[in-house]
């Protein structure tokens, strides 16, 4: 997911999942640093501000880890910018660039006079990286975990993929069937399965807002300027008042019309996985598209079995990752 997010952003492939000739893998420093940022950010919500600010001044504990992580991420951003510059020759892209027809996000910012400040540019790029990597990379394990517990739902998804697969020609005998974004676009049930996962396991489980001025909430609570409001999206997705008595069940049909052919309207302020209103995630449809193509390709080509004995639980972090990872067995399907 790190490479998937970085390639369209920087116009170059970091190659974190590539192997060298000695079969060793490149260091995952930047990816690990992002995990640290999210974990320390969560810790800041659990302890008094005076405590973490003191640790920051003394450069100890979690704040020391955060400072190191920021250094790693800044170095990564600088390296990617330099690498992007190398593959641009006389204003033209060379063969190593991301796409001959589409400009990568980094290039658009470099050409924007409002982003001449390197610190601002680094901050914006890393924000894109965090959002692009974590939304997809965090959600997919939960998607496959839920689907593995519900084989009937997997059967429905495969039945909807079947007519699409019958029209596609595999690259070679025995090759995997790869689904493209256009193939999965009409699959509303698959989208519903993703949304149902995000309801129960939102990639960002908490939403933090700072009050700008004195106001009274619709609930009647008075808030003052400077107050911090924490919204638990994880809890909201499991509230009976919002989602009904079966709120803890994994049921994609709850997102569909009675005939199952269209997606039912659900207000964004009720389903905040992609935020709401003017702050709704601009990359929402891109993230959904990428997840649909990945899930469709995996489910069509493989049976996914969860390895027994592992403890499935979330990590204490601003991102709802699986604490112990997710181990599965993939068995090639006989098609």
What are these regions (language model features)?
Residues 218, 224-225:
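Residue-level recognition of short, solvent-exposed, well-ordered loop/turn junctions
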Residues 131, 181, 255-291, 315-317:
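Cytochrome P450 heme-thiolate "Cys pocket" and heme-binding signature region
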Residues 1-140, 156, 170, 177, ...:
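Cytochrome P450 heme-thiolate monooxygenase catalytic core
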Residues 135-148, 294:
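Short, small-residue alpha-helix embedded
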Residues 234, 320-335:
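C-terminal helix/juxtamembrane-tail motif
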Residues 151-153, 229, 284-321:
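Cytochrome P450 heme-binding "Cys pocket" and the immediately downstream C-terminal segment
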Residues 231-261:
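Conserved cytochrome P450 K-helix/beta-meander segment immediately N-terminal to the heme-binding cysteine loop
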Residues 75, 174-219:
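Conserved cytochrome P450 K-helix E-x-x-R motif and the immediately C-terminal K′/meander segment
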